[in-house]
Amino acid sequence: MSAGEGWCVATVPFLETDQQLGRCVALIGTDSGRYPYGNSLMVSGPEETVLIDPSLAIAERGGAPRHIDRMLISHAHEDHTAGVSTFPHASVHSHHDDLLALHSLEGYLQVYGMPEEMAAEWGPKVVEEFNYAPRLDATGFADGHTFDLGGGQRVEVVHLPGHTRGHSGFLIEPDGVFFVADVDLSAFGPYYGDHWSDLEDFERAIERCRTIDAKHYVTFHHKGIVHGRQDFLTQLDAFAAVISKREQRLLAYLSEPRTVEEMISHRIVYRPNVEMLFVTHVERVSINHHLRRMCRVGSVVELESGTYRAA
């Protein structure tokens, strides 16, 4: 490891798992970026270098292979900001809608929208296990904003809400790299289980991803790098199909009257053996997203407050 110059954070060696994509380097996290780790993207131009989504793996490496001038955060979730405190002198930016989470822990917890008792337990975990520290100097960006790194190298914000209100991807040109963040193409499927999530916004975000023509697509989790538009679209179709599969499972379960609590215990998002602090919260939020839509289109009816059945 070599020391950085001036106030720079120390630079660290490249790893064999790091993958070069033009002037971009995908810094692949532990176990292909499986949660709680993730795949960060470093983009260098003649004038500055930015790091997109500094992950827990970056924090454990103790820095990045180049001096980082700026950090771009796709959205306010603990695994995407775990390396922010590693670069205290780099500026940090997120979409305006998620910016409050970078300013305070209270703002961070507001994005999740957990019940008070759960938030009291989750908050310390975000600090202790994901290195959270407020960045009052963090500033916001909007859809279409472009960060100019010099020499024609640029990073454009692509707002992809649904996962959170501010969730954004980044299109890097002229390399043709599209960082899609948590449109992660995983078998788990789309996550819309927080207070600031929205199922139908997520579906629209998926459709917007289809319109972006790139050479390489980088996910924060699991897949890492997908080369070529056709392969990306095939995997995106499978990812999106998980939403309808969840809805069909829920509809089948509602062949007889069920309460929301029964649906939560039955689960449509997590497998029955998964035990994590936030599972019940995620199931509740996700199921309510589906119920609202199913009631609106008439496939489900509410018999009495909190009890539903397939129409």
Model-identified regions with their sequence ranges:
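A structural signal for the main folded, soluble domain(s) of proteins
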Residues: E5, T17-D18, V43, E47, ...
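Short Gly/Pro-enriched turn/cap motifs at secondary-structure boundaries
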Residues: D31-G33, L136-A138, H159-P161
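Active-site HxH/HxHxD metal-binding segment of metal-dependent hydrolases
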Residues: P36-Y37, L56-D148
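Divalent metal-coordination and catalytic microenvironments
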Residues: V43, D53, H75, H95, ...
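Conserved beta-strand hairpin/beta-sheet module of binuclear metal-dependent hydrolase folds
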Residues: T11-G63, G169-S186
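Metallo-beta-lactamase
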Residues: T49, T146, R154-V242, V260
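C-terminal regulatory/interaction regions
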Residues: E5, R249-A311
